[in-house]
């Protein structure tokens, strides 16, 4: 809007006219008296100044545009200044008496008296300045770039009052009090300042040097001086106008203000009373009223960016008073409803009060504007937050309210005003950090709400190792609800209200040695909660000062985030402290194996808990046992046990035994009388493909078994030579077989999901002796297995998958004997045997993408198996020499020795180990096999199905065989 024009200056009053001189007496005879001179005319009154013109309103809308202004964008024009009143005119001077005539023949007559002087005219009135026009700018999907942004015009000064005129003069030049000067004209009032409104519907706002919302109030005009006559008056000063209101509505977009954001214009100074000349007892004129500063209001509904370097809410009152008090400072209001915004500092209130006139009865006169900051949603981050100032008597109050969203500030100074946090569960104030997600505090709050079964109302987070001082008697504060209605000096009404949550960074205050909180004797509700963040290498034996009073939280309402540590409050005459002890893991981590629990307790006592450690073992254990990461204690146990027993979770040892004994079983089937494949002198070459599916028990946690599914396949290639009647009248068969295969174990139930991709290769030497119904078999074998285990952690752990590479070596030797009864229906073949096996597992390193999580030692385990059973078979001979032999085998296997592997696991940087191991074989196994052999000439082909069941495993396999007999 255009600036209002200044009013025209009032015209000065005209001076009184001088009287005419008395007439001269005639010469000669007795002349008559000279006639009286006429009175001088009165001076004319000065004209009233013309009013200033009104500024026009400006309205601009930008759509899909970009506006670059190399200077200042002003919305809302300044008011026009009131013009000065005209001075009163001076009184005129009296005329001289007439001159006596000269005697000639008679007596000369006397000259006539001079006429009286005229009065001075009154000064004209100063005119009112024109009003500044309002300015409105709307951005829709547009960008505005400017050096400075000013919303709300400045108020202007009122005009000065005119001086009173001087009294008239007598004929001799002396003062003639009967002839008055003119009255001084009053100064004109300043026009109204225009309001400014900027609305950002969407787009971008870039300001380099700062944003000012709310114009400054104008100064009052000074009164005119009373120069002489007590019966006259000087003109009064005109009133200064109030600053225009500045409003910023930011609906969505990006703001980047690299200067200050000032909300509220300063108040103007009052006009001074006119002076009274020396010796004059009258009262001089009054000065004009000062204008109040315009209010500044900013509302951010959505968006992101920097609001400014310094946010100043509330402006100072006027500096000086006259016959009236100075103007009030404009209030500053900043409201954030959503979005993500930042600044370097926030000062709410703390502006200096202006000067009040002597005897002022209005306590609010010349007061500085108060500052109001409200966060209803979203996030706001700043470096320093100050509420009010130390000089509580001479400055305005500040008000900070977090009713929703998260406010994070590095430093907080609560001096004068109010602070409240609450209104909904998400409302939170973080002090000591600008990280709104600091240390996953929201997860701790969510866990606590879940345990309590209700939402908490308002959260205060204290970190950074710096004391949060809320003890100022001029500060009213509360977290949560139900303490008191906020009003200054509420005393014990301050404190932690119903269902409030206070979160304290324990390690930060252990390290700094400072008390975390000064409350000034505040109260704590019986339902208020305290959550201790146990992290950053906090360990058993640490201690810190929590608060300066004893009105703390009830012991049942104090919770630590780590299940490895116990935090307790201790009060004495000086305040409340927190001690850190080792937790009873039988209570906090029920089901954890004793040796693992001892290892974790040792970590908590020596390394401490640290969810962000470079030591990945410490990080994994700390996160797994922290309520901010894993809500369920049972899940904590599962994750830790799965990670430290990754080999068992992946079924490494069980698979190594199964795939290592599988070739020996195929060799014995190849040599068994059950298949009745004729072997004459010469060489046999045989190939056996196989596929298996296994459902097996892996890791047992808290008495509950976890299971894995395994799918594997392999191929055996063997060859042997038969020597007829080569030993004790029986046939001797000797050969060797090579095996190769691969598979995968998938464990998803009851543990962290684990995959074991394994492969194996081996060699077996075997020999069989057969004489009539007797058959004895012996073998020795070696199998090497390679296992690549991957374990996926829950998403809440925010860690990459665990990996471990393991190698195993299985050596085995076995002996089996069988006898064949031939009946008219079938062959009945009972058998019995013994097998020795030794499994060696190399040491391994469990790791993730950041480093080592755990180290597992090597292990050596030896066990025996004793199989017994019976098989039946029958031959069917067809045309063309084809022989078909179906068979069925039922058996039982008992195991003794090391049926479980045993190793030790350790964490990086920590002395001490825990026991770990996995299932090798079950004590008792039942086996059923059935198949058919087809033989013709030199070829034989077989197919069988095997089923083995134990308490921990069910194994299904399909095996084929192809044999060629060289004769």
Predicted regions and their residues:
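Extracellular/periplasm-exposed beta-strand and loop segments of Gram-negative cell-envelope proteins
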Residues: 46-52, 85-92, 120-127, 161-165, ...
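Feature marks extracellular polysaccharide-active and adherence modules
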Residues: 61-63, 70, 76, 138-140, ...
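Residues that define the transmembrane beta-barrel architecture of outer-membrane proteins
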Residues: 131, 192, 242, 292-294, ...
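Extracellular beta-strand/loop-rich repeat segments of large surface/secreted proteins
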Residues: 362-363, 379, 384-386, 390-394, ...
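Solvent-exposed adhesion/ligand-recognition segments of exported proteins
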Residues: 537-583
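Outer membrane beta-barrel translocator domains of Type V secretion systems
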Residues: 610-823, 827, 942-965
């Amino acid at each position: 809007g255009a600036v209002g024009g200044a009013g025209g200056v009032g015209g000065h009053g005209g001076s009184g006219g001088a009287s005419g001189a008395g007439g001269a007496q005639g010469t000669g005879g007795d002349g008559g008296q000279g006639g009286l001179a006429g009175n001088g005319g009165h001076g004319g009154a000065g004209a009233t100044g013309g009013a200033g013109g009104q500024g026009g309103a400006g309205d601009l809308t930008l759509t899909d545009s970009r506006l670059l202004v190399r200077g200042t964008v002003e919305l809302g024009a300044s008011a026009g200044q009131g013009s000065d009143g005209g001075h009163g005119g001076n009184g005129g001077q009296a005329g001289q008496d007439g001159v006596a005539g000269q005697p000639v023949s008679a007596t000369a007559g006397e000259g006539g008296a001079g006429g009286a002087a005229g009065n001075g005219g009154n000064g004209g009135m100063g005119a009112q300045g024109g009003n500044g026009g309002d300015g409105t700018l709307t951005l829709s999907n547009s960008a505005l770039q400017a050096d400075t942004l000013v919303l709300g015009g400045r108020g202007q000064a009122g005009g000065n009052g005119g001086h009173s005129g001087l009294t008239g003069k007598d004929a001799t030049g002396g003062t003639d009090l009967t002839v008055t000067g003119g009255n001084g004209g009053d100064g004109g009032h300043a026009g109204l300042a225009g309001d400014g409104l900027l609305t950002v519907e969407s787009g971008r706002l870039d300001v380099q040097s700062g944003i000012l919302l709310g114009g400054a109030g104008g100064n009052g005009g000074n009164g005119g001086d009373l120069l002489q006559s007590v019966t006259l008056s000087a003109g009064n000063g005109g009133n200064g106008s109030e600053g225009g209101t500045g409003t910023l509505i930011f609906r969505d977009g990006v703001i980047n203000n690299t200067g200050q954001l000032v909300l509220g214009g300063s108040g103007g100074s009052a006009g001074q009373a006119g002076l009274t000349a020396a010796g004059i007892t009258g009262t001089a004129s009054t000065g004009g009223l000062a204008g109040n500063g315009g209010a500044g209001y900013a509302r951010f509904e959505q968006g992101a960016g920097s609001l400014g370097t310094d946010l100043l809410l509330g402006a100072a009152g006027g500096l000086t008073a006259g016959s009236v008090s100075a103007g009030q400072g404009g209030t500053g209001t900043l409201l954030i409803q959503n979005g993500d915004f930042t600044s370097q500092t926030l000062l709410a209130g703390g502006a200096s009060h202006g000067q009040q006139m002597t005897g002022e009865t209005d306590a609010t006169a010349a007061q500085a504007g108060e500052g109001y900051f409200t966060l209803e949603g979203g996030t706001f981050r700043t470096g320093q937050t100050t509420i009010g100032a130390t000089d509580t008597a001479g400055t305005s109050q500040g008000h900070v309210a977090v009713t929703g969203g998260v406010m994070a500030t590095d430093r907080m100074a609560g001096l004068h005003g109010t602070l409240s946090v609450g209104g909904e569960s998400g409302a939170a104030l973080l002090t000591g950090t600008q990280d709104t997600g600091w240390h996953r505090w929201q997860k701790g709050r969510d866990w606590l709400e879940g345990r309590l079964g209700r939402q908490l109302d308002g959260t205060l987070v204290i970190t950074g190792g710096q004391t949060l001082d809320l003890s100022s008697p001029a500060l009213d504060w509360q977290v949560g609800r139900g303490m008191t209605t906020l009003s200054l000096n509420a005393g014990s009404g301050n404190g932690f209200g119903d269902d409030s949550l206070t979160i304290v960074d324990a390690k930060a205050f252990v390290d700094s040695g400072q008390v975390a909180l000064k409350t000034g004797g505040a109260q704590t509700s019986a339902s208020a909660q305290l959550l201790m963040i146990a992290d950053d290498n906090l360990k058993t034996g640490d201690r810190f000062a929590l608060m300066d009073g004893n009105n703390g939280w009830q012991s049942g309402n104090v919770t630590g985030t780590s299940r490895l540590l116990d935090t307790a409050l201790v009060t004495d005459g000086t305040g409340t402290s927190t001690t850190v002890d080792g937790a009873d893991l039988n209570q906090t981590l029920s089901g954890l194996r004793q040796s693992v629990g001892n290892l974790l307790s040792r970590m908590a006592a020596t390394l401490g808990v640290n969810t962000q450690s470079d030591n990945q073992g410490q990080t994994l254990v700390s996160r797994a046992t922290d309520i901010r990461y894993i809500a369920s204690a049972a899940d904590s146990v599962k994750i830790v046990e799965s990670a430290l027993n990754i080999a068992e979770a992946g079924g490494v040892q069980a698979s190594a035994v199964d795939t290592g004994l599988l070739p020996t079983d195929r060799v014995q089937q190849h040599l068994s009388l059950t298949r009745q494949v004729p072997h004459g002198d010469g060489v046999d070459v045989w190939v056996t493909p196989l596929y298996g599916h296994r459902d097996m028990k892996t890791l047992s946690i808290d008495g509950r078994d976890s299971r894995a599914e395994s799918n594997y396949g392999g191929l055996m290639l063997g060859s042997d030579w038969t020597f007829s009647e080569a030993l004790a009248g029986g046939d001797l068969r000797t050969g060797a077989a090579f095996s190769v295969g691969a598979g995968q174990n998938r464990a998803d139930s009851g543990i962290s999901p684990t995959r074991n991709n394994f492969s194996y290769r081996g060699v077996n030497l075997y020999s069989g002796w057969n004489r009539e119904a007797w058959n004895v078999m012996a073998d020795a074998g070696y199998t090497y297995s390679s296992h690549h285990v991957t374990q996926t952690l829950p998403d809440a752990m925010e860690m990459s998958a665990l990996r471990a590479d393991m190698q195993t070596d299985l050596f085995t030797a076995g002996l089996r004997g069988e006898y064949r009864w031939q009946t008219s229906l079938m062959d009945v073949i009972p058998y019995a045997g013994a097998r020795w096996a030794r499994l060696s597992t190399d040491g391994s390193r469990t790791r993730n993408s950041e480093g080592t999580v755990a180290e597992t030692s090597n292990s050596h385990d030896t066990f025996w198996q004793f199989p017994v059973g019976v098989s039946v078979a029958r031959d069917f001979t067809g045309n063309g020499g084809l022989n078909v032999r179906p068979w069925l085998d039922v058996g039982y296997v008992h195991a003794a020795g090391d049926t479980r592997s045993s190793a030790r696991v350790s964490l990086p940087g920590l002395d001490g180990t825990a026991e770990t191991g996995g299932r090798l074989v079950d004590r008792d196994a039942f086996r059923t096999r059935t198949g058919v052999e087809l033989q013709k000439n030199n070829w034989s082909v077989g197919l069988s199905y095997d089923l083995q069941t134990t308490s921990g495993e069910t194994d299904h396999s399909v095996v084929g065989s192809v044999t060629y007999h060289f004769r």
